C-alpha cells in the first residue's frame, strides 16, 4: 500500500448523500441515515436557542445509536456465516492469485546484486544507479519516500486484517483459506518496502536515518480501522487501497522512466510493485463481488459507508518529527507531481463501481440499500464538480506556493501549494 494511495482526497470527504426528496418533511442524511428535521421557522419564538441545541444533540445521539446498531449487525452470526461459507470459494478463486515463492520476484532481482555481479560489477552497477537517480527531481523523491514508508508499515496492516471477524488468522498459523491468504498476501507485500528501501539507500539521494525514523513513527502510531472488525468494510477498504497503490506506483514508474527522468532502475522497481498490487487488487475485488452476490444490501451499504467517509489513508499519521501538517503537504505534493491525484481517485471509484456492477444491483435491496447504490454511482461526478469549484476558488484566491525543507532529502526545499 502506498502513501499516496488513498490520499482520500479532502474533496471526497465533504460529500454526503442527497436529502430524500420523496418525503413530505424536510430531511437530511447523516452517516447515510435519513433524519427528519424541523425547520427553524416552526421553532420560531416558541422554543429557545438552548432547546434547539438540545434537540439537535438528541438527533445526533439517535443517529449515532442507529449507526452503532448497523455496525453491530455486520458482526452478527448471520453476516459472519456468509464469510465462513465462502471458504471453499476462496480456496479456488483467491489463493491461486498468490505466486509460489520460487516464482516470485525478490528485491535482489531488481537491483545490483554482488552475488551475481561480483565485487567490481556490483560497484559499477551502483555507480550507474546513482548517476541515474541524480536526475530525479526532489518533488518525486518526497512522494517516493511517502510510498516506501507506507509499504514498510506492513505489520500494522496484517494485524488489522487478523482482527477482522470470521477471516482473521487467530493462532498465527491457521490452516483456513482466509488465514493462508492473509499470510501469503503479507509475504508478497513485504518485498515492496524492502525493494524501495534498498533502492533509496543505494541511490544516495535520501537521509536514510530520517526516513527510517518516519517508518518507526508510523508503525508505532498504529491505524484505527473504522468500523473495526467488520469483514464487509475491511475488504471494500483493502480493494480500494490496492487499486490506488497500483495506480500510484504505476504513475511513479512512468514519471521516472525513459519518457520521464530516465531512471530505469527506479521505473523497473515501481512498475514491478504496481503489477503485484494489481494482482492483490484482483483478489480483494473478487471478494467484494462475491459478498455483493451473497448479501447485496449489506454489501452496497458497506461500499457507500467507506466512500462517504473517504477511504482513510493508512499513513495519515505520517511524521517527520517536525511538521504537524506533513500529511497535507504530502497529499498536495502527490497531486502536483502526478503520482496520485483527485482524478485518479475518481477513476478508481468508477473502476470499482463497474467491477462490482453496482449500478445493476436491484434485487434484495432495501430503501437504504438503493440510496447507497445511487450515492456510489453518482459519487465520481460529484467529486469532479467539487474539484472544478475548488480550482476556481484557488485561482480567485491567487494562492502562492510555499517552500518547505524536507528532512528526508537532507532539508532540501520543495515548493508546495497547500489548500
Swiss-Prot record:
Describe its assembly: Homodimer.
Needed cofactors: Fe(2+)
- Show the taxonomic lineage: Eukaryota, Viridiplantae, Streptophyta, Embryophyta, Tracheophyta
UniProt keyword annotation of Iron present: yes
- What Enzyme Commission number(s) appear in the record? 1.14.19.-
Cross-referenced CDD domains, in alphabetical order?
Acyl_ACP_Desat
Recorded metabolic or biological pathway in which this protein acts? Lipid metabolism; fatty acid metabolism
The alphabetized UniProt keywords are:
Chloroplast, Fatty acid biosynthesis, Fatty acid metabolism, Iron, Lipid biosynthesis, Lipid metabolism, Metal-binding, Oxidoreductase, Plastid, Transit peptide
Which Pfam families does this chain map to? Answer: FA_desaturase_2
Binding, Fe cation 2? 189, 242, 277, 280
Q: Which family does it belong to?
A: Belongs to the fatty acid desaturase type 2 family.
Question: Which leading EC class covers this enzyme?
Answer: oxidoreductase
Q: A GO CC term? A: chloroplast
Parts forming coiled coils: none
- Under what name is this protein listed? Acyl-[acyl-carrier-protein] desaturase 6, chloroplastic
Which molecular function term from Gene Ontology is one that the record holds? stearoyl-[ACP] desaturase activity
Q: Name one GO biological process term.
A: fatty acid metabolic process
Provide the binding site for Fe cation 1. Answer: 151, 189, 192, 277
Amino acid at each position: 500500500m502506498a502513501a499516496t494511495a488513498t490520499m482520500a482526497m479532502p474533496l471526497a470527504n465533504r460529500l454526503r448523500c442527497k436529502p430524500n426528496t420523496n418525503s413530505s418533511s424536510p430531511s437530511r442524511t447523516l452517516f447515510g441515515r435519513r433524519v427528519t428535521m424541523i425547520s427553524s421557522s416552526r421553532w420560531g419564538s416558541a422554543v429557545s436557542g438552548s432547546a434547539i441545541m438540545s434537540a439537535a444533540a438528541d438527533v445526533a445521539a439517535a443517529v449515532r445509536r442507529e449507526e452503532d446498531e448497523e455496525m453491530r449487525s455486520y458482526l452478527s452470526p448471520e453476516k459472519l456465516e456468509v464469510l465462513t461459507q465462502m471458504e471453499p470459494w476462496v480456496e479456488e478463486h483467491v489463493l491461486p492469485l498468490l505466486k509460489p515463492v520460487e516464482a516470485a520476484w525478490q528485491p535482489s532481482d531488481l537491483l545490483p546484486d554482488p552475488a551475481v555481479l561480483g565485487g567490481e560489477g556490483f560497484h559499477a552497477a551502483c555507480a550507474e544507479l546513482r548517476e541515474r537517480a541524480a536526475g530525479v527531481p526532489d518533488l518525486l523523491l518526497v512522494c517516493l519516500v511517502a510510498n516506501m514508508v507506507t509499504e514498510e508499515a506492513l505489520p500494522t496492516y496484517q494485524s488489522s486484517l487478523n482482527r477482522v471477524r470470521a477471516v482473521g488468522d487467530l493462532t498465527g498459523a491457521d490452516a483456513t483459506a482466509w488465514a493462508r491468504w492473509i499470510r501469503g498476501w503479507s509475504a508478497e507485500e513485504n518485498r515492496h518496502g524492502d525493494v524501495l528501501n534498498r533502492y533509496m539507500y543505494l541511490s544516495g539521494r535520501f537521509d536514510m536515518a530520517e526516513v527510517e525514523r518516519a517508518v518507526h513513527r508510523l508503525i508505532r502510531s498504529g491505524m484505527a480501522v473504522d468500523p473495526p472488525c467488520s469483514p464487509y468494510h475491511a475488504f471494500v477498504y483493502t480493494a480500494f487501497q490496492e487499486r490506488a497503490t497500483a495506480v500510484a506506483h504505476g504513475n511513479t514508474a512512468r514519471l521516472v522512466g525513459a519518457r520521464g527522468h530516465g531512471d530505469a532502475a527506479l521505473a523497473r522497481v515501481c512498475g514491478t510493485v504496481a503489477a503485484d498490487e494489481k494482482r492483490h487488487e484482483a483478489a480483494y475485488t473478487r471478494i467484494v463481488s462475491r459478498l455483493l452476490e451473497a448479501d447485496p444490501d449489506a454489501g452496497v451499504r458497506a461500499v457507500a459507508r467507506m466512500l462517504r467517509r473517504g477511504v482513510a489513508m493508512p499513513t495519515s499519521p505520517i511524521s517527520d518529527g517536525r511538521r504537524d501538517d506533513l500529511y497535507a503537504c504530502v497529499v498536495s505534493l502527490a497531486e502536483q507531481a502526478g503520482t496520485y491525484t483527485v482524478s485518479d481517485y475518481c477513476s478508481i471509484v468508477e473502476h470499482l463501481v463497474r467491477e462490482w456492477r453496482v449500478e445493476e444491483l436491484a434485487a434484495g435491496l432495501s430503501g437504504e440499500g438503493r440510496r447507497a447504490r445511487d450515492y456510489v454511482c453518482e459519487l465520481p461526478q460529484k467529486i469532479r464538480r467539487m474539484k472544478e469549484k475548488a480550482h476556481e476558488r484557488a485561482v480567485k484566491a491567487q494562492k502562492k506556493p510555499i517552500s518547505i525543507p524536507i528532512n528526508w532529502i537532507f532539508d532540501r526545499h520543495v515548493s508546495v501549494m497547500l489548500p
